Structure formats: C-alpha cells, structure tokens
UniProtKB/Swiss-Prot annotation:
Family annotation (CDD domains): REM
Entry function: Promotes the exchange of Ras-bound GDP by GTP.
UniProt cross-references to Pfam families, sorted A to Z: Beta-prop_ATRN-LZTR1, RasGEF, RasGEF_N
Protein name: Ras guanine nucleotide exchange factor F
Induction notes from the record: Down-regulated by Pseudomonas aeruginosa, PAO1 strain and PA14 strain infection and by phagocytic stimuli.
Domain of life: Eukaryota
Transmembrane segments: none
Biased composition (Low complexity): 23-53, 67-82, 133-154, 1103-1127
Length: 1127
C-alpha cells in the first residue's frame, strides 16, 4: 500500500516517456489483429435493412412489423464470424428477434463493419449513466486557471499527461498536441476469472455498487433477447448469475438507474414490441418487483436514456411506436418519474435538441449532457453537446474547444469526477477498428482525445464504468472480457485487493472497530500504551483484561455458553447441530459431574440476588444501584449506537411545535378538494390527530392508530396524547380560550383514546410493554381525567375492562350440521373414517383462529441489521406461528400418505382423500390451507410415485396451481379472494409480499418527515385483513379436531428417512411380511400418533439451527418455509 502511494505521488512529478513513433509496431499483443476490410465498406449502400426488427448500429431505427415474429433458422455464431471474414465486401447482420441472417447492407452498415473484429455486428443500445453511484465528486465549483498545462479534469495534472516545453528543451523531439492526453488501455486478462460463464452482451443496462458490477438484459450473440441478471464481484473477479424472484421480461435497449440502493429498469424492446413498464431490484432484499405508477406515462419506447436527479428519473428521447398505425417515431421529449411517490409527469422544456436515439445522457451537478445519437433517417446527428438544466428546465448547446469528436451513435459515456469520457460507438468517419476515447472537461469546456500506445478492438453498445482510478469497458463485441483505461500504470490487481480489504473493514460493527485496529496493528496499541501518561486515556489492554462487572472470572465464557446451547439441543435431540458446533468451535459437549443442568445451576446462583424480581421484566436492571454501570465498559464501547432509533426526532413537547410550514408538514390536495397529509413530524401528526378545530378526519385516525408502530412506539404515542391533553395556560381571554382550545383538544384526545382501546386493543393486551401501557393509561384516567371531572371516565374504564375479555362475534344462524362418522367415539377412529368436508372444516377452524390472532403490527415488516426485511418470533410471534403451520401441514400430508399401509390401494385412497379435501377447502375460501395441502401433494417424494395419481387427480391439482399462478400479479387468486365471503383465510405469502413491496418502494421518511402516504398504503392492506379475520360459523368436533389441531412436526430429514425405509422394505427378503414403520407408529398412519415426532428425533435432525431457522440440508424440496421468513 505504501509503494502504491509513493507511485501515485511520483506520477504527478514525472514526465512519461514519449510515445512510439507512428512507423513503429504497437507493443501490445494482447488483442487479436483486426481483419482487413475492403475499403468499399465505407461507402453507403442503398439496400434497405428490412430483416431486423431492431436495427444494428448505423441501421434505420424504424421497425418492420411483419418480421417481428420470425424466430427460426438462426445461424451459429461461428458461421457468422467465418462468413464476415470471408465476404469482406459485405456484413452479416443478426435478426434480433431470432430471424434469418442474410447479407444485406443498410445506409450505415458497411462503415460499421470496420469496428468489429469479425463476427456479428451488435445492435445498438442506450446506456443510462448513474449519478451518485460511488463516483467521486468535487465540491469546488470554481474553474481552474486557463492554462494548457493545468487540467481540472478527472485525469491527473497536465504535467504527467502532456509533453511540456521542458521535456522538449531537454532534447525531446516530440511535438506537443495540447488537445491530446496520454493514457494506457489494458486488456483485462486479470479479470477473466470465469468469463466463460457469461456470453457477450450488448444493449444491456448496468450499474456499479460498492461490491461489484451489475448488468441486466440485452442482446446475445445469436441475436436473441435476454433477461439475464449478472454481477461481477470485484473482490473475487468472478461473474455470478443472479436469479431472484420474478425478473422483468426479456428485453433490449432499455435503461436502468440506481436510486436508494435499488436498480430501476424502464422500457426497452421485447419480441412483443416496445415497452413502458418499470421494474425495481432492491439490493437490500435481493428481490424484483414491478412498480405501479401514476400520472402521464411515456409511450412504449426503446433506445432512450434515463438519468437520476433530485429523486427523479429523467427519460429523454428514444423510439416509440404508435399502437394503431405501427408507425415508428424518434422523439425528443422529456418525462420525469418521482421515484419516491411513483408519479410520472411530462416535462415541457424550451428549445430541446433534435429528436434522437442511440445517444447517451450523463448527469453532473444538476445538468444532463447529451452526446450523439441518430435521427429519424438513421443519420448520425451533429457533434454538438446539448445540456439540460433540471433546476431551470432549459436546454442550451455547448461548444467544446480542443479536439473534435466525430458524430457517432451507440457509444458509451461515463462520468469520472468532472469529466465525461466517451468511448467506442459507430461513426461514419471512423476508419480504425480500435477503441477511441474522448474526454470532455466540463470545467475547461474542452475536449481531449485520449492517446495510448496500446490498442484494443472497438466496442459498440457496450458498458463503461468507473472503478477506482480506471474506467472498465465490457460488452459490445465478440469478446466477453474486460478492457480498462487508466492514466497511470496497471495497478488494477492491487486496487482490487485494496477494495476487498476496504469492504471487509466496513463490515466490522462499529463497536469492534477499535479492538480490530489494535489487533491488526499492534504497533499502534504499543504506542498508545506508552503514551497513557500524556493522553490520560484508560489502558486498552487493562480494560479488556481486568476483571469487572462485565468481564470477570465468574462471568460466562463463550465455552460455557456453548455448553448451555448444546445442553438445550441435546434435550431436543438435535444431534447433527451439536456435531456441527463441536466441529466449528472445538468445544466438546460434556455433561456436568453432578448430572444437573448448567442452566439450573445458574438459576440457583442468581436466585438470591433476584429475590423478588421477575426475570422476564423488560426494565430489569443489569446491576444493582450500589454497583452502578461499569465505567470500563463505556471506554470500550464508546462507539456503539443503537441503530434502531437513529431516526428519532428530539423529544420536543407537542405544544412547542411551530405552525404549519415546509419543515414540519407536507400536504397535497386530493381530487375532491380535500387536503391530505403527505408527510409530517411526529408532533405535527399529533396536532392533526387531536385538532382544535371541529373538523375531524376519521380515516386519518384509523390510519394513524393502525400503523403507528411503524414509526414510533405505543408508549411514546400515549405520552404525546397526554401532553396534548395538558393544554398550556394562556394570557388571552380565558373563557374563550377554554371553549375554543382547551375543551375541544381534550375532548379529541379522549376520543382518540376511546377508539384506540376499543378498535385497536392489541397494543394493550399483547406485547412486552402492554402492562406498562395499561398502567400509564390507568394513571391518566385516575389522575388528570378524574381531576378535571371528564365525563368520559366511565366509558374509558368500561373499555379498559373489555380488554380482559375476548371479543366474540356471534352469528345469528346456527352452524351447519357436522359430518361425523358412525364410529366417532371409537378408539379405532382414524383419518380414513372422517369425511373430507369435515376434515376441511376442522382445519379451517384451526387456521382461522390462528390468523385471527395476528394483530396488525405484526404484519408490518421489521427492519433488522443491515437493512434486511424479516419476520421473526420475537416481533411477530402470532404471524410466525401461522406461517410455520403451513410447513407442518405440507409435511404432514407427505408423511401420512407415505406411511399409509404398504398396500398401494390404501395409499391411493389416502391421497384421494386429501385431494378431495382441497376441493372442500376451496369451497370454504380457506386459501392458506389449500396452498399448504397443495404444496404437500407436489412434494418430490410423492411426485416420484406417479402411479398413485389418477388423471382426475392431476386435473384437480392443475386447477389449484392455476389459482395460485403468478400471472398478472396473482390475478386469479386476487379475484377469487375479492369474491369471498367475510369469513376466509387468505394466502399469507401474498399479504407479506404486498407489505414488502411497500417497504421496498416507499421510504419511511421524506426529508426527515414521517412519510404518512406510505402509512395510508399500509392501512389499505391492514383494513382488508381485518375483514378476513372474521370467524367462521362452524362447529368444533373435538374427536376430529384431534387429528388436525396439533400436527406432528416432521423435517425433510424425517420424510427422506421414511422414504428410504419404505424402499428398503420393498427390496428386503421380508417384503411380503408386514413390518412396523421406523417412524414409531404401527399399522396405518391415518391413526395419528402425536408422539411420533419426538420418537423420530432420535435421528440426527437438520431442520433447525441454533436460531431456530430451517436449513433442510438433506432436502430436495423448495416448498418448506423457514421460521424466520425473509422477504
């Protein structure tokens, strides 16, 4: 690292050697020699290119609709390459929709052939440049002194780039070109780790993150379109294909922008024509989702550009298609999408540039710079640079001095500090097959041509990204490797190592930064210890070594904690997890000498100290008052922060909040002329929750109380309401002030409390702080309300008592008569004796009760460390219980069918019973259990026995699969759910997905204000859930409910073990003799043995790890759900 810094310092003070003379051969041999191309290729041909639905570089952008679906007889890439080299007077064009490849020329096609190293010509693209994506920026906006020897561009200073007069005077004979800069272009041999895993792409979109380079879609060498999603990891120098959820459809010539750690894909061309849909990929949740937008959306288009500025995606130009006349039009319009509100709008600006496509647009400090492109007649536009200013909504043309870049299209542009680098592309005037690079210095308004002693082949419709002090080029040619450009020597390998080390350090928690530094650099620790007398700081080594309350000889060591964990796992027979812990930690599990559990021993030790304490109290102090907090802990952990509350505003009294202004509230007027709150501070929301005015919005009250847990806690809300009730005194007219301010505000506060206790009781009767909340409410009722003689005291106390009783909503009519078997009271009652409808009813009662017990706060996604969205048992216990039952039902179905008597006929009967049960579940609108049973019926262990399924069975399963199909965002399921009666059990996966989409696409805060629009969207889902939680009018049959109430918990390992045992019985010499099942039950498994799961656990289990999440290492199925559900 030190050598690297020394080199970069010397680079600015040394003059590089003169470049080789023009008659000398190039020293670079890394790139293959370009084939000789007949000079006739430079003359345009009049043959129209009518076979390609997407024009190749230089071809007309107009499409021929009748050829869009020609998808046969695609020649192999090798044959195209050979054909292109052997027939040098013509060029082979690929039909991008998959059609035939023929040798025809278009007006600009023949000059384009000079750019390729043989092989197929790539179609053009429009590459969106990303502003703010880890690109360096300078704060100093003042232009530098005008001098040919001083440059404020992204490259190093002119002394290290240009040949100065001093070098000439010292004997140099080189003629200085002030419009040329010298750099180095390298062929990325060191970056080809697994380049064979990815085909060359063009017309794709890309973005750069801290850890890698991401690309999506584009055109493949055979001319077909793709929706591949790849990442190139800088640290390991390897390509990886990403397959997350429902990716956008295949497309090319689309655009992509990076915003809020998400990649937005817009438009493009697909086999069905141009598109104007928009998808987003969240790098936090690693999922795709389609973005639903409002407003004036751009027409379907491709070949456009998109950039981001001030939270808006700005779309310019491109080719659109009239859906009626199929007429193709090149545009110069501008559309803006607010990425926070998802609102489209057309921007009407003055003096826009001529219509164009295949151009580039780059954003720099509020200005969008547009370079090159093609017009309606496929002619490359002038080389004038157009600049659009977002703040003033105006266009202007900029003339750059210095070198002149030839008009071109299908090039790439990238921002590097304060310069834009243009590379490659198709140009009429270009006769070389080498990659050309131009630098546009935005401060000096000067264009420099980049000269290099090494050459690489030209690229068209490629990517160019900044990494460190280099610019990487990928795609747009027959090779799938990287080339990269740098003003210094080839230090790319070292840069990657530094980046990897930087990312590793950034992943260390802040509280461990100091300890990690001391461990990695003992010389710093030694220096710190020697200077303690001067600095006065506490000894770091002493802090970590001296016994104290936090770390002492009696404290629990990590070995002891591991023993505690393994004791728990041993009691639950998780032997495989214990073996993994022992292997990883080197700590062997050993029983205590006394035979008593270590946990029991610990409880005996702490019992005298905790005497009258409840160990489950959330406010239990770790230390007694006389001990206090260990001061040494503060020294070590002074960098620690509680990230869960980093967005909390300062606790200001609600009455000290100022009047409405842009800093504390944002409003919007609705279609019916009503003012709606878009975002506000917490105090300002309390103002509108209990306003002084008589006008009161009941919908605002519902949204606030149902969703308040997403931006505050119930304790803080109650504290703010009490603050609002305590109206400060005023020196104004006392009677008028009391009647117009004091009494209305207090009445509104009491009304809010009544609605909260009555309609949202979950905050008071569930959760770790519910007792504190109830105690605070009691104090308020017995204190302020009683003292003021409020008339609502009685009503509030009645509602508070109601919290202790379950709210039962009876039906006016009796439930339907249950279908009980004749031997209902027989000890030999099995599942085979029970009617399918009654099985479905009892399962529905269980699922409905579990679903009805989920309070709304548990549905809202919780954000834990590193921005990952998760549900877990700590924050959503009822929801997780409901989700985990889906896994239990699916595996119970599989186990019950497999463990049926070895007679194939009985297995088919049991399978038939479950399939008929699915039809009954569908009639009962129990979609959750229906999906769980369907997952069990589609388990690989059952699908491996196709002889058990009849054609009728397959037909019923196919109908259910269609119901849960992802087509049109689960359209069939959503329509079926809308037609359901109030009593239904929805499919929980769709509810979680709807919540997750809102969390991904809508920020929680807007300019330090609570995004209340997001809470309104959350409430729309929560209000529907409330209707679904209506109980069923069904009667419990206890004998039947025994079979489906508490299902045994089987793991994938258990199911595989059962399958293997059954297979071994079939192959054994005693196959004709009845043998008991290895699972612990005998005879038919329809007679459910609820203890069989515990007996089964004597085998090594892999379904749960220490944290309780399912790993299913031995499973080939993807149908299982984890107790921690990642969205």
């Amino acid at each position: 690292m030190t050598d690297k810094l020394k080199f970069k310092t010397s680079l600015l003070n040394k003059v590089p050697p003169p470049p080789p003379k023009s008659n000398q051969p190039s020293p670079s041999t890394s790139t293959p020699a370009s084939p000789n191309v007949n000079s006739t290729n430079n003359s345009p041909s009049v043959s129209p290119a009518t076979t390609s639905p997407i024009p190749s570089p230089g071809m007309s952008p107009l499409l021929t609709p009748e050829n869009n679906n020609n998808n046969t007889n695609i020649p192999h890439q090798t044959s195209l390459l050979n054909n292109s080299i052997s027939n040098k007077s013509s060029v082979s064009f690929l039909n991008n929709s998959g059609g035939n490849t023929i040798n025809k020329s278009s007006p600009l096609s023949q000059s384009s052939s000079n750019i390729k190293n043989g092989g197929p010509i790539r179609t053009s693209t429009t590459l969106a440049q990303f502003s703010g994506s880890s690109l360096p920026n300078t704060e100093n906006s003042s232009p530098p002194p005008s001098s040919s020897l001083i440059s404020s561009s992204s490259s190093p200073t002119a002394e290290s780039l240009l040949y100065s007069e001093d070098s000439i005077a010292s004997g140099g004979t080189v003629t200085v070109d002030p419009n040329t800069k010298n750099g180095n272009i390298y062929n990325g041999n060191g970056l080809r780790n697994n380049s064979a895993d990815i085909l060359p792409h063009n017309n794709h979109t890309y973005c750069v993150g801290d850890d890698g380079f991401y690309l999506f879609g584009g055109t493949l060498p055979d001319g077909s379109y793709t929706n591949d999603f790849y990442t190139f990891q800088f640290a390991i120098k390897a390509w990886t294909i990403l397959t997350f959820g429902s990716a956008p459809s295949i497309r090319t010539r689309h655009t992509g922008v990076l915003y809020n750690n998400s990649m937005y894909i817009f438009g493009g061309y697909s086999p069905s024509g141009p598109k104007n849909d928009i998808y987003v990929f969240s790098f936090d949740t690693q999922t795709w989702s389609e973005v639903q937008t409002e407003g004036t959306k751009p027409s379907p288009r491709y070949g456009h550009t998109a950039v981001v500025e001030s939270g808006h995606m700005i779309v310019f130009g491109g080719i659109s298609c009239d859906q009626t006349t199929k007429q193709q039009t090149v545009n110069n319009d501008i559309f803006s999408l607010n990425l926070d509100t998802k609102q489209w709008s057309q921007v009407l600006s003055t003096c826009p540039p001529s219509p164009r496509t295949h151009h580039t647009a780059t954003m720099h400090k509020g200005n969008m710079y547009v370079f090159g492109g093609q017009d309606q007649q496929s002619n490359q536009v002038e080389d004038i640079v157009h600049c659009y200013t977002w703040a003033s909504n105006s266009w202007k043309s900029i003339q750059f001095e210095g070198s002149s870049m030839t008009p071109r299209s299908d090039h790439s542009a990238v921002l590097f500090q304060d310069s834009i680098f243009i590379s490659g592309g198709s140009s009429k005037s270009q006769t070389s097959q080498n990659l050309e690079i131009y630098e546009y210095d935005l401060y000096q308004k000067k264009c420099f041509k980049i000269s290099s002693s090494t050459i690489v082949q030209n690229r068209i419709s490629h990517s160019s990204v900044v990494k460190g002090n280099s610019i990487l080029f990928w795609g747009g040619c027959t090779d799938n490797s990287f080339d990269y450009f740098s003003f210094g020597k080839d230090e790319f390998e070292e840069d990657y190592q530094d980046d990897y080390e930087s990312n590793r350090v950034q992943n260390i928690p802040k509280e461990l930064w100091e300890a990690s530094l001391m461990k990695k650099h003992p010389e710093i620790l030694e220096l710190r210890e020697k200077t303690l007398a001067f600095t006065g700081s506490k000894s770091f080594a002493k802090t970590l070594a001296t016994p104290s309350f936090s770390e002492n000889r009696l404290a629990l060591s990590h070995q002891f904690v591991l023993q505690l964990i393994m004791e728990y796992l041993e009691r639950n027979t998780y032997h495989k997890v214990i073996a993994a812990i022992q292997k990883e930690s080197g700590v062997l599990h050993q029983p205590t000498e006394s035979g008593e559990s270590r946990l029991v021993s610990l409880l005996r030790l702490v019992k005298p100290r905790l005497r009258n304490k409840n160990v489950f109290d959330t406010d239990l102090s770790l230390f007694s008052k006389e001990e206090g907090n260990d001061p040494e802990v503060a020294v070590v952990d002074h960098l620690y922060h509680d990230y869960r509350h980093f967005d909390e505003e300062e606790d200001i009294n609600v009455w000290e909040e100022g009047e409405d202004n842009n800093r504390n509230i944002r409003k919007v007027e609705t279609d019916n002329n009503k003012v709606q709150i878009k975002a506000a501070t917490f105090n300002k929301l309390i103002h509108y929750l209990a306003p002084k005015e008589k006008a009161f919005d009941p919908n605002f009250l519902k949204v606030f109380l149902y969703t308040h847990s997403s931006f505050t806690t119930s304790e803080k809300l109650l504290k703010k309401l009490i603050q609002r009730y305590q109206v400060p005194n005023s020196n104004a007219n006392e009677p008028k002030y009391k009647s117009e301010v004091v009494e209305p505000v207090r009445q509104r506060v009491v009304d809010v409390l009544k609605y909260w206790v009555d309609k949202c009781p979950w905050d008071f009767n569930a959760g770790p702080t519910s007792s504190v909340l109830v105690a605070t409410l009691n104090n308020f009722i017995d204190g302020s309300l009683t003292r003021d003689g409020n008339s609502n005291i009685k009503k509030l106390r009645e509602l508070k008592k109601k919290l202790q009783h379950e709210d039962v909503r009876p039906y006016s009519e009796p439930p339907p008569e249950p279908k009980v078997p004749k031997n209902i009271f027989s000890p030999q009652l099995t599942l085979a004796h029970i009617d399918e409808l009654e099985i479905a009813r009892q399962m529905t009662l269980v699922e409905s009760k579990l679903f009805g017990a989920i309070p709304p706060p548990e549905f809202m996604v919780r954000v834990i460390g590193y921005g990952e969205f998760q549900y877990n048992m700590a924050t959503s216990p009822n929801l997780m219980t409901f989700v985990n039952r889906a896994t239990d039902v699916s595996r119970w179905i599989v186990h019950t069918v497999l463990n049926e008597s070895r007679d194939k006929k009985n297995k088919m009967k049991m399978l038939d019973k479950f399939i008929k049960t699915t039809e009954c579940l569908r009639q009962l609108n129990n979609f959750q259990t229906l999906h769980s049973v369907l997952q069990g019926l589609q388990h690989p262990l059952l699908l491996s026995r196709p002889d058990l399924f009849t054609p009728r069975h397959r037909e019923i399963i196919a109908d259910h699969e269609m119901l849960f199909s992802k087509i049109d965002n689960y359209k069939l399921y959503r329509e079926a759910l809308a037609r359901s009666q109030p009593a239904c059990v929805p499919w929980i996966d769709i509810i979680r997905e709807d919540f997750a989409q809102i969390e991904r696409d809508q920020p929680s805060n807007m300019n330090n204000l609570i995004n209340f629009t997001k809470r309104q969207n959350l409430y729309e889902i929560l209000s529907k859930i409330g209707h679904y939680q209506f109980p069923y009018n069904l009667q419990i049959v206890h004998q039947v409910a025994t079979f489906v109430n508490k299902l045994p918990k089987y793991s994938e390992y258990d199911l595989n073990l059962l399958s293997e045992s059954l297979q071994s019985q079939v192959n054994s010499p005693l196959a004709g003799v009845y043998q008991p099942s290895l699972i612990g039950t005998t005879g038919s498994s329809s007679s459910i043995n609820l203890g069989s799961a515990r007996e089964l656990n004597n085998s090594n289990r892999d379904s749960n790890n220490i944290t309780g999440s399912s790993s299913n290492n031995n499973s080939n199925s993807s149908n299982s759900l984890s107790p921690i559900v990642k969205l």
